[in-house]
Amino acid sequence: MSGLFITFEGPEGAGKTTVLQEIKNILTAEGLQVMATREPGGIDIAEQIREVILNENNILMDPKTEALLYAAARRQHLVEKVKPALEQGFIVLCDRFIDSSLAYQGYARGLGIDEVLSINEFAIGDMMPHVTVYFSIDPEEGLKRIYANGSREKNRLDLEKLDFHTKVQEGYQELMKRFPERFHSVDAGQSKDLVVQDVLKVIDEALKKIQL
């Protein structure tokens, strides 16, 4: 695997999706091969699963069903899009990956981080990210951003109460303790330009290590 797999994680409203696109543009302008993608989604089958997962009408969805659907979408996305790009030497920037399942379903939904990790290890094998950038923001501020952004696509997770999003944040904090070697936290409460600068520093360090 000759590429660099970087995932962007964080609670709702952290701004990672916007920053990811800007990072892609900057790295591409520098002459690097970059592919941006997202989860759940990124390819046709996974996008169809995304519609089921995030549909606001699916309020009866069981937490285990939710976790399994995410893992299924992740597997297809990985083998169809992410892995081929890495094999071609691309920098892959992915908006959410395994850690979202661990924080949301494993911790916030109460399924257990280890249990959800087991499901996802079956789905992705040893294809863990090289680097994970965590966008740190107060959950309440993140939700305010969501509802202030009229153009943002609202989904079922946005309808969860603040308590759920606080648990998601706690879940990510637990993951940073478990995987300190790949997690890098940036302050998402800053201006977008400062967040972009901080993320670029993380990526530059990763590029130096692998000399891509």
From Swiss-Prot:
InterPro entries: P-loop_NTPase, Thymidylate_kin-like_dom, Thymidylate_kin_CS, Thymidylate_kinase. Keywords: ATP-binding, Kinase, Nucleotide biosynthesis, Nucleotide-binding, Transferase. It catalyses: dTMP + ATP = dTDP + ADP. CDD domains: TMPK (cd01672). It comes from the Bacteria. The keyword Magnesium does not apply. Its EC number is 2.7.4.9. Belongs to the thymidylate kinase family. PANTHER family: THYMIDYLATE KINASE, UMP-CMP KINASE 2, MITOCHONDRIAL. HAMAP family: Thymidylate_kinase. Phosphorylation of dTMP to form dTDP in both de novo and salvage pathways of dTTP synthesis. This is Thymidylate kinase. It comes from Bacillus subtilis (strain 168).
